[in-house]
């Protein structure tokens, strides 16, 4: 899943900032998955020359914004019963990648006159609720296993490229925000009626691999990049994670 918003290299953008508020153009990409599945690979791509809504209070000016939001719900549950031997398993594999970038290209000139802002903002929010479980019962031997694997990669980047010249009558803000909330429950339960204490064997395994890259930057490796503002210049990156895992 890729969401890009940018001003191309060498472009010239001027906002007179004669109005009180900016009229945002929404370039939001949203992915929703609500189903039982064993494997998810999301490779959709979207590139736009757009502006996007964000949680910013701004005067009229120039906004280059990219926003991506993913809500993933997964339920994988199995069960089995037998008078003799009962074996059951649940396996879930989730692989997901998201790239959200907002930038002003090389040698671009962006001017926001009067009391206008220049905003370059990338925001990516992710919510995952994942439940994997099994229940088995038998009169002799009962065995069950639940295995859940999540691999998630995110790149959230807001930047001004080399050689660009930004002039703002108010503030210049370059901001990258990434938020993640994961709730993972992996449960395996079994019973062997009348069997020995070793007659019921159950296991639950949860593996989570998260690779996040959240950056906000002004590049100037080979050419000078000039930012001038009558107000403030802010460059920051923020990554917030809430992870709850229950396995047993």
Predicted regions and their residues:
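Low-complexity, glycine- and small/polar-enriched segments
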Residues: 1-248
């Amino acid at each position: 899943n890729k969401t890009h918003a940018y001003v191309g290299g060498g472009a010239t953008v001027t906002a007179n900032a004669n109005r009180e508020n900016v009229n945002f153009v929404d370039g939001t990409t949203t992915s929703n998955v609500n189903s039982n599945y064993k494997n998810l690979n999301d490779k959709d791509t979207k590139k736009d020359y757009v502006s996007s809504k964000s949680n910013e209070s701004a005067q009229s000016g120039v906004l280059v914004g990219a926003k991506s939001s993913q809500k993933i719900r997964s339920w994988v549950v199995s069960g089995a019963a037998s008078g003799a031997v009962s074996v059951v398993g649940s396996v879930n594999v989730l692989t997901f990648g998201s790239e959200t970038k907002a930038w002003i290209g090389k040698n671009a000139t962006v001017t926001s006159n009067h009391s206008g802002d220049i905003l370059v903002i990338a925001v990516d929010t992710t919510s995952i609720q994942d439940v994997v479980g099994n229940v088995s019962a038998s009169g002799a031997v009962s065995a069950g296993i639940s295995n859940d694997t999540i691999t998630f990669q995110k790149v959230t980047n807001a930047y001004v490229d080399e050689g660009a010249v930004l002039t703002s009558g108010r503030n210049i803000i370059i901001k990258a925000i990434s938020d993640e909330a994961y709730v993972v429950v992996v449960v395996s339960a079994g019973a062997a009626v009348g069997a020995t204490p070793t007659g019921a064997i159950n296991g639950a395994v949860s593996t989570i691999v998260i690779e996040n890259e959240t950056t906000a930057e002004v590049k100037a490796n080979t050419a000078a990049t000039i930012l001038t503002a009558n107000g403030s210049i802010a460059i920051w990156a923020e990554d917030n994670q809430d992870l709850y895992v229950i396995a047993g």
